[in-house]
Amino acid sequence: MKNLQITAYMQHFIRQQVMPGDICIDATMGNGNDTALLSQLAGKRGRVLAFDIQKQALEHTKERLKRDNCPENYQLLLESHENMDVYAGTETVSCITFNLGYLPGGDHSVATRADSSIRAVESGLKLLKKGGLMTLCIYSGGDTGYQERDEMLAFIRQLDPHKYLVILSEYANRPNNPPIPVLIIKL
């Protein structure tokens, strides 16, 4: 693996998971990197739902999807990720990805929050089919990042081990609160 950024690390697992025809969710659309990857992997027969509360994220993602010639299998939603269960059925989703924090290049005062992110993860876990994958990139710092990190880690640690496998990784030798990669597999 040449690119050692957390997003590339997580996309390695996403590539192993998503097959043509799958239903996928990008819970935090951002600049559209994961949305584009999910769209390409799911292919013409697949479906991708992407959520963000910032219009700027939606516009950046539209541009990215067009630039990458992604199949038109996506729905970009200007809505909170905690409402994803309105758009997908229980145990139908193969992969859900989250990048918690703020929009890169955007307003740092607008960021994900622990309460809505935990509700979104809870909702997403119900949507995942057996064998489905949820990825979380937990960025800390900023005004609410430490609180979100701590509350999210406490939440995922209490998930039923008979229903979910939670793999928590860390950058052991990186300074300044490096992001935390988390994989959750529905058993």
Where are these regions (language model features)?
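Conserved SAM-binding motif I beta-strand of class I
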Residues: 47-52
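Conserved SAM-binding loop of SAM-dependent methyltransferases across substrates and taxa
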Residues: 31-45
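Mobile active-site "lid"/loop adjacent to the S-adenosyl-L-methionine
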Residues: 98-120
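Conserved beta-strand signature within the Rossmann-like core of class I S-adenosyl-L-methionine
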Residues: 28, 120, 127, 131-138
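S-adenosyl-L-methionine
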Residues: 1-22, 36, 40, 58-91
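Class I S-adenosyl-L-methionine
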Residues: 148-187
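Helix-to-beta-strand junctions that scaffold the AdoMet/dcAdoMet cofactor pocket
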Residues: 19, 42-43, 128-130
